[in-house]
């Protein structure tokens, strides 16, 4: 694996790659407030060992990429999609498979709408529609416990790394599915990396200021790339119905249901996820 910082769209974006650059590329795009460390290193290596060139990167305002003062609202999800395409440019990759989780899945959808010529396939994990063809669609909201947890963060002493680590671990616990074992040691190690790597940890909350874009209403039907939707039945952040909505709106899509999984990329599911992704991406 090799970590590199590139100047992309005039800003620093931190990336890391796994595997042989000559292999077909899979770009991993993580969700809101989370850096690339939440794509577990072992997961990336397992994916690369199947014959893929795997790239993960820090979105704006997390990890070692550019950060802005907390409370700053100066970019859009579309800008983040352009960053993802810029990562492909930086690695001199003409076309790639995109794999996005949560907000990363929405970034992936926008990239597919704006740059279809760059996309081989899409994989959308624990995410939702960027814009619906169905104006009457009423998708279930995020669990109140998660919203309360986020609200409690405003009273936290963010200078105390131990307090912050405990808070972030407890947030991950809320996302774990009822039929998955929460591995506190694993999550703590991720959180520790997150805290130590961050240029400005509090800047991650700028992602909460991102707003939807009406320009993407009713455009999902235009996505032609084969799409694999992966969703847990016990997702408390974006309930299972969000995954079903994607299947309903993206023409060439299939669903992998993770029974009892939450809003997570849980190690118990890696074998099924990687098998499905390899089968999905090998068709192109």
Q: What do the predicted segments below correspond to?
A:
Residues 11-67:
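Conserved HGGG/HGGXW glycine-rich cap/lid loop of the alpha/beta-hydrolase fold
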Residues 78-96:
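Conserved acidic catalytic loop of the alpha/beta-hydrolase fold
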Residues 105-116, 122:
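Short glycine-enriched nucleophile-adjacent loop
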Residues 122-157:
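Flexible "cap/lid" loop of the alpha/beta hydrolase fold
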Residues 143-218, 225, 245:
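Alpha/beta-hydrolase
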Residues 223, 229-231:
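Short beta-strand/loop motif that positions the catalytic acidic residue
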Residues 236-242:
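Conserved alpha/beta-hydrolase "acid-adjacent" motif
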Residues 253-284:
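Catalytic active-site module of serine/aspartate enzymes centered on a nucleophile-bearing elbow/loop
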């Amino acid at each position: 694996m090799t970590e590199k910082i590139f100047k992309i769209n005039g800003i620093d974006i931190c990336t890391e790659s796994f595997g042989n650059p000559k292999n077909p590329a899979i770009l991993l795009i993580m969700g809101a407030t989370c850096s690339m460390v939440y794509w577990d290193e072992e997961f990336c290596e397992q994916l690369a060992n199947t014959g893929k060139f795997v790239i993960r990167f820090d979105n704006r305002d997390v990890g070692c990429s550019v950060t802005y003062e907390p409370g700053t609202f100066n970019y859009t999800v579309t800008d983040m999609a352009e960053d993802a395409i810029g990562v492909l440019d930086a690695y001199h990759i003409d076309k790639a498979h995109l794999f996005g989780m949560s907000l990363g899945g929405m970034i992936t959808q926008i990239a597919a709408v704006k740059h279809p010529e760059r996309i081989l396939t899409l994989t959308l994990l624990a995410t939702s529609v960027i814009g619906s063809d169905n104006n009457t669609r009423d998708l279930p909201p995020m669990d109140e416990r998660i919203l309360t947890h986020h609200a409690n963060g405003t009273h936290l002493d963010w200078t105390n790394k131990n307090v912050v680590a405990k808070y972030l671990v407890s947030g991950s616990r809320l996302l774990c599915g009822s039929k998955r074992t929460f591995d506190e040691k694993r999550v703590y190690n991720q959180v520790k990396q997150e805290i130590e790597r961050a240029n400005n940890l509090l800047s991650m909350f700028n992602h909460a200021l991102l707003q939807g874009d009406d320009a993407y209403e009713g455009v999902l039907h235009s996505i032609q790339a084969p799409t694999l939707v992966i969703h847990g039945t016990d997702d408390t952040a974006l309930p299972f119905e969000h995954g079903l909505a994607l299947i309903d709106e993206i023409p060439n899509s299939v669903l992998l249901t993770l029974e009892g999984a939450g809003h997570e990329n849980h190690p118990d599911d890696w074998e099924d996820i990687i098998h499905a992704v390899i089968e999905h991406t090998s068709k192109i």
